[in-house]
Amino acid sequence: DTPEEILFFKSIFHQLLSLFTSPFHNKRFDFGDEVFWGKIAALGEQFSSDKQIRKMNGNRGSKHFLYMNRTGIKERRHVVKGDGDTTTTMGVKAAKIAIERAGIDKDDIDFIVFATLSPDYYFPGPGVLVQRDLGIKTVGALDVRNQCSGFVYAISIADQYIKTGMYKNVLVIGSELHSHGLDMTTRGRGVSVIFGDGAGAAVLSREEDNTKGILSTHLHSEGQHAEELSLIAPGMGKRWVTDIIEDNDPQDESYFPYMNGQFVFKNAVVRFSEVII
C-alpha cells in the first residue's frame, strides 16, 4: 500500500473509533461514494461504577488494575430490568437520530442491516422488528451475527449494496443488550466487566461524487479459535433449552458467554494491526 492509502485507512479507523468512544456528539463521516451519518444514541440508564466493577473482580486490586489498564473501562451502562428496553428498542432510538442527522425521511430508507448477538428473540431477528417499529415501508431487513465485528460486517454489506446501485440509503444498526445474560459473580468477571448495553446507528447514502469512496474492506476469520470466545447454549448442536432445564445444574456455565481473555486480547492486537496497516 502507498503511504496515502495507509493514512486513508488510519483516518477511517480513527473516525470509527471516535464514533464509538464519543457517544454524545453527532458525527458526519465522508467516505466518498458513501456519506456515513451516525451517533451512539441509546445507552443503558443504569451504570456499573468503578467500585462495582472492582467488586466483580473480587476486590483484588492488581487484577482490577489490569482490567482497567487494558480496557480503559471506568463504567459500564446496563439496561434496567423491567423498564422495557430491549436490543430492538435501543436500536430504534439510535436509528431515529441517525435518520434525522442524515437529513432524510424514514421512507427514504431502502434497506436495513442490523448487527447483534443479543437479539430480542431467537427468531425473527431484530431487523424486521425495527422496520415495524419505525413504520418504514416493506423494505428488506438483514440480520448480521458476527459478534464484536458485526457492525464492521454490516457496514461492508451496506457499502456493497450502494456500490452496486441496488440501494441508495441503507440503515445500519449495531445494538447489544448483554447484561441480562451475564454471570455477574466473580466467576464471570472475565466477560462481565467488559460488556455493556447500548446501540448505535448509521445511514450510508450514495452521493454523486464518485471520485472517492471506501477503497476496500478486509474481512477475515479464524474459525479454529471459535470456542475461545463463545456462547454455547442454547444451541441446536450442543445444548438446547430442554437440556438445560432437565439437568437443572447450578454449575452449568454453558449458557453464559465464555472468553479466553488473554488469548483473545493478544490475537486481536496482532490481527487488527495487521489489517489496519
What are these model-derived regions, one by one?
Residues 5, 126, 150, 154, ...:
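Internal, well-ordered alpha-helical segments in soluble enzyme and binding-protein domains
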Residues 123-124, 182-184, 226:
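Short glycine-/acidic-enriched loop or helix-start segments at secondary-structure transitions
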Residues 64-89, 117-170, 175:
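Conserved catalytic cysteine-centered active-site region
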